[in-house]
Amino acid sequence: MSLKADFLGTANKKGEKKMSIAEQFAALGVVPVVVLNDVKDAEPLADALVKGGLPCAEVTFRTDAAEESIRIMAQKYPDMLVGAGTVLTIEQVDRAVNAGAKFIVSPGFDPEVVDYCIEKQIPIFPGIITPSDAAQAVKRGLKVVKFFPAEQFGGVATIKAMAAPYTTLKFMPTGGVSLKNLKDYLSCDKILCCGGSWMVKGDLVKAGEFDKIAQMAKEAVELAKEIRG
């Protein structure tokens, strides 16, 4: 079966081209990686991210609350970039998309999950860590991949080395990315954006400190824009 990814922007009713998911990621510079243990936190968290100028969330499928949280966030903010992370199976892909997820992120490269998403034209950003993973992504026509866990596997230096032979790929490093090293990552032209959880930490969500989350989201977006000019 020959599968090629083609997640390009589509035209709206006025004939204007809409930005693709990847283009929207690039414009933001940062993608919040969210873990929600209680669905009651979904709406106020979405409010905080939108207020902070970061209308995007990769909601990890690690908890029982993930699916319904995606549904709540997507319904409250239809234009928000709400996606599902830590997706391991086709069944989870279907559940996430049915709940309103606009994109799928997986921690590793599972050919079955990736091929399914491509076939269904669901934007998929699979995790890679080796040149063999990168080769599989390129073979399928993918343009953007997650690099995870980033810091534990060499960070920017490894990404630059990996990008040298695989020139068509852009990377979304996640894992160990913070305000302290964001400049190192976003200064690399092979990096599309960074995934991070520092602005949506579990303890802040649990404590209901959504104003602080909004402020931290704002700081992250402003720093990303400053770095990239």
Residue ranges and their predicted role:
Residues 89-99, 132-140, 178-192:
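Catalytic cores of alpha/beta
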Residues 131-143, 155-165:
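Anionic-ligand binding region
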Residues 50-55, 76-79, 98-104, 119-125, ...:
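Glycine-enriched alpha-helix->loop->beta-strand junction motifs that scaffold or abut catalytic
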Residues 7, 13-99, 119, 179, ...:
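Conserved N-terminal beta1-alpha1 strand-loop-helix module at the mouth
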Residues 34-35, 56-63, 81-88, 101-109, ...:
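Catalytic beta/alpha-barrel core
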Residues 171-179:
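Active-site glycine- and acidic-residue-rich loops that bind
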Residues 107-113, 146-155, 190-209:
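Glycine-rich phosphate-binding active-site loops on the catalytic face of alpha/beta enzymes
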